[in-house]
A protein has these predicted regions:
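Sec-dependent bacterial lipoprotein signal peptides
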Residues: 1-20
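Ser/Thr/Pro/Gly-biased, low-complexity, turn-/loop-rich segments
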Residues: 2, 20-259
Length: 259
């Protein structure tokens, strides 16, 4: 005969196992020992549409140099300063650079863009030996889903990795699927056609350190889907309350029949 105390214990155990995630579901990088070392390589960022570039020119002729280095002394808003000082890459992949005109920079690395701008200035005999510096002003990523602070985040370091990006968003929630994080990235092919590439990242395995998605690039979108426990709890069929109510009814019926 099944007593009432036994019934309560059964229901408690079922609820405990149904709702709890295992360590394998939530721990990061589970296959790494303290002695293991990893060589991490970072790819150079390639300029995309809508990027804002700050281009600084230095030379022995300061008067001619002034036209390439506008001053934002009358602008107080930080976003306005960003746009005022920068050259935005238009839908054709070009920037309209001062008196020189349009320069196609889409798909170039920052170093390649520096070399191109310097070459054009010298070939047009504007400056003899200019020093060119280019910085990307609007580096950002977007993170959505099961993180504590989803949203758009600006960053200003050259090599940002996915763990740092997740940390900026307050870490994953306990309901985040750590084995199938998606990273959407803008890409440009050799024929200049544009597309998005989707990476899948498993944070429970050290393999992701060698993934192309380990490095987060400007414009990346990170999507953290809910894990199976979260989906079950949110559903109707898999809802734990529904399941326990049904089980309670069945067990209660057994007790009544047994008595």
């Amino acid at each position: 005969m099944l007593g009432r105390n036994s019934l309560g214990l059964i229901l408690f155990i079922i609820a405990l196992f149904y709702n709890c995630s295992t360590k394998k579901d939530v721990l990061y990088v589970q296959d790494v020992s303290d002695k293991e070392l990893y060589n991490v390589s970072y790819d150079e960022y390639k300029i995309q549409l809508d990027d804002v570039l700050k281009i600084s020119i230095l030379s022995k002729d300061p008067e001619t140099t002034l036209e390439f280095n506008p001053s934002a002394s009358n602008v107080t808003n930080s976003k306005e300063i960003l746009l005022y000082n920068g050259y935005q890459v238009n839908q054709n992949g070009n920037i309209n650079f001062s008196s020189i005109g349009e320069i196609n920079v889409e798909g170039l690395t920052i170093i390649q863009a520096v070399e191109l701008v310097r070459k054009i200035i010298v070939e047009n005999k504007i400056l003899i030996d200019p020093i060119v510096d280019i910085k990307l002003l609007n580096t950002h990523f977007i993170i959505l889903g099961e993180v504590n602070r989803p949203g758009k985040y600006d960053f200003f370091k050259n090599n940002l990795n996915i763990l740092e990006a997740i940390g900026m968003a307050g870490d994953l929630t306990i309901n985040g699927e750590r084995k199938k994080i998606k990273v959407l990235r803008n890409k440009i092919s050799s024929d200049k056609s544009r597309f998005k590439k989707i990476f899948s990242v498993d944070l429970t395995s050290s393999d992701f350190i060698n993934s192309d998605a380990f490095q987060i690039l400007s414009g990346d979108i990170i999507i953290v889907n809910p894990n199976s426990s979260r989906i079950k709890n949110a559903g109707i069929i898999g809802n734990s309350g529904t399941l326990l109510s049904l089980l309670s009814f069945v067990l209660s019926s057994i007790i009544v029949i047994s008595n």
